[in-house]
Every structure is written in C-alpha cells, then in structure tokens.
C-alpha cells in the first residue's frame, strides 16, 4: 500500500513494505495463513497528494513452492542487432541452461551458464502499436526449477532534443492514470486493465504514466503484449510544504527513496514497455533549489547506475517560478505539470496560451526534449454551455485544442500526457465534487467530448517522425 504494511504468517511478521507500492515477500517453510496486520500506532501526518489512499490488500497474494535450489532472478539486456546479454541468479550451484523462444514458441538461440551473451538471428524488434510489440521468452532452467522471462528487443535513448526508440524519433501520446474504479477502488482487476488498454488503443494513444506509484506487475505485462509505452514512477508525491518547510532538511526521506527506486527498477527492468523512469511527482524545487538538487540528482545518477538497460530518467516538476528550479533542467527529459487555463489564468485561454509560451521559451534554452507530463481541466460529464465555460465538456475541448496547438509549433516538444485517463476518487474537500473530474473518461469509462477531440488529434499524429 501507499502507507506501511506488514505480512504475517501465523501471527509472525515475515515481511513489510513502507509505501513503495511495488512488491514484497519472504521465504517461509511450512503452510502459512496470511493476514493483514495493523501498525501499533497510527501516526498523524500531512499527506500531500490528490487521490484517495485506500487501505487493505489491493493486489494478488501468491504462495508458491520452489526446489531447494531455484532461480531467484533473471536480467535480460537485448540490443537491436539481436545480441542479448543475460544473467540468472540462483540459490545454489546447479547448472543453468537458457533458451530463447520466439513468439511462436520456437527455440532460436541457447546457451549454458548463469550469465553470457547470445544472438537471435533475424531479430524482430518491439515497437508500440500500430507497430508490432514482438515478444521473446528467455526460458531458464536450474536443476528442477524453470523460469520464463518475456522480453522485447528495442532501444531507447535521448539524442539532442529527440527521444529515439529503435533509432526513430518518438512522440508520446499518453494518459496519466490512477489505479481506481468505482466498484472496487484500487483493487486489482485484470478485466478492467484489459478494458482500459483497449480504450487506450481506441483513443489512438501510445503511452501511460504510472502516476503516482508503480502499478501492479500484471499491468506492465499487458502493456508489453499490447505495445503501450510506460513512464514508470516512484510514489514520491508532493515532497514539500512551501517556503515555511524545507523537506530536504526536515524529513528523513533520502534513504527510503533510494530503496523504493531500486525496488521499482529491479522489478520492472525487463519490461520493454518501460521506456522512462520518473523519480517522483511535483516536489518543491523552487524554495530551496540547492537542497532540492542535492537530494534529487543523486537519485538520477542512481537510476542510471541500477538500470541494466540505462533508460532515460526524469523528474516531474510543477513550480510557480520555474526559473528558480535548477534540478529539472538536469534530467534527460524535461517533464512539466502545468495547468494554464485551469488553476492558473482560469478560463482565459488567450492568457493561458501566452503564459505557456513564455515558459516554453525558457525550457527551449535548456536544449532538452520537453514533455507536458500533466495538464487538464475538471469536466462534469453532461454539463454543456453555449460558450466554453469552465467545468463544461465544451471547455475541456477548448482547453486541449488551444494548448495542443502550441505544442505542435515546437520541434523539441516530444509528448503530452493528459490528466487524467478517467475521473477518480479523492479525499473530500471544497475543490473536489465527488472526486477529481479531469478524466477524459468518466469513472465508469464513458468518453467525454474532450476524449473525442483527442482521439481525432492523436489519429493524425504518428508515433514516429511527427516533428522530423
């Protein structure tokens, strides 16, 4: 969960997890009974995020058995020339054999040993749809144990002001999401995941940002198979409290943040859909700029160090005075959350476009690829106005129409992640009427007018070569 949780077997603690929403587990001999355990004390804190923090078990609990010697982990690092570096971690000394299977289950390469390099002849590359998200399987055996790891062969890199996938300039057409549904909150639902992925395809989108935490592993498996790009984000949300509190001095977060980042990368390292790591969402980078840099830049370096595929790394920023931010400009891709026309310059789209362009001129000077990692407008489904007034479906269309036109003028602007895929629940408050209504779909997945506009827009934007 987003808060601390503990796993007990027969009332004995065997594992715990402190808010990374990734995974945790433990070796155990015997037949267990598993129950959720509450902390002895419920600390009073100051949460700073805009989604409902559900409690309970959200994702599958799996009990499995292994031989005495078994495979603990597999790492796959493929290259577009067909060479594949692999490493198999085992608990013993039994010999390891690996075989690469193609999408039809045919063996195309094999090797012996816990690590090495093998070559796939006439390799098929993984690409997002409408390309082919081709998947291979590394079939590893160690004694009696078997481990199958799917992988895709693709490259991802930043070169100048472009993001290149398999050497081709990429444009992200994406949604920010939440694990949330009207019937069961954040509870894992494989059927809903299939529904959402089909809607992503229907919308002519190609990407998802896992705002603001790592999602269930099964969602990444689905994105691998369905050819959807993923910006994978840690649960570091809203670190900051304004000018009165320096979070980098007041809160002991750094060590835990390093652990959470390492666990996310370890879990998701083999997914071809994951093309970008996000260190966190909307921290305070403005009031204590040097302390912020000293906190975040080591995490940036750690992500590059830990990722065997060395994907690009970013940090999603949201500052009133972006000129004071000395951290975002050091990331591989500049990702900005901005609400011109909504929270800022509310309802005045002429002024909103002017403010956006003033800021984009600033980021152009950094000579980095730039993406809008969040932007949106609360929209009440069924609310219509003669003019494009705030909260109406007409305003949502006008909001995206005007801002998107500004993005298209700039060759170094490489993507847009709209906020949000669907309406979702939040804590109650004077700014929220039954949750956040910025979804392009309602909470039960019905499209608003803004979604029909974006569907048409994205149909006209190719995944590759849009701004060549």
Question: In which residue ranges do the predicted regions lie?
Answer:
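Substrate-binding clefts and catalytic carboxylate motifs of secreted carbohydrate-active enzymes
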Residues: 42, 49-56, 68, 273-277, ...
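Secreted/periplasmic carbohydrate-active enzymes, especially glycoside hydrolases
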Residues: 1, 5-6, 10-217, 222, ...
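Short hydrophobic/aromatic-enriched beta-strand-loop microsegments
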Residues: 227-234, 332-338
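Aromatic- and acidic-residue-enriched segments that line the glycan-binding/catalytic groove
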Residues: 20-29, 224-229, 244-256, 291, ...
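The substrate-binding groove and active-site-proximal loops of carbohydrate-active enzymes
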Residues: 46-50, 178-191, 199, 203-211, ...
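Generic beta-strand/beta-sheet core signal
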Residues: 10, 173, 210-211, 233, ...
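Active-site-proximal loop/turn and secondary-structure-junction residues that shape catalytic pockets
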Residues: 157, 214-216, 236-238, 280-283, ...
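A short beta-to-alpha transition loop/helix N-cap that caps and shapes the active-site region
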Residues: 14-17, 241-242, 287, 323, ...
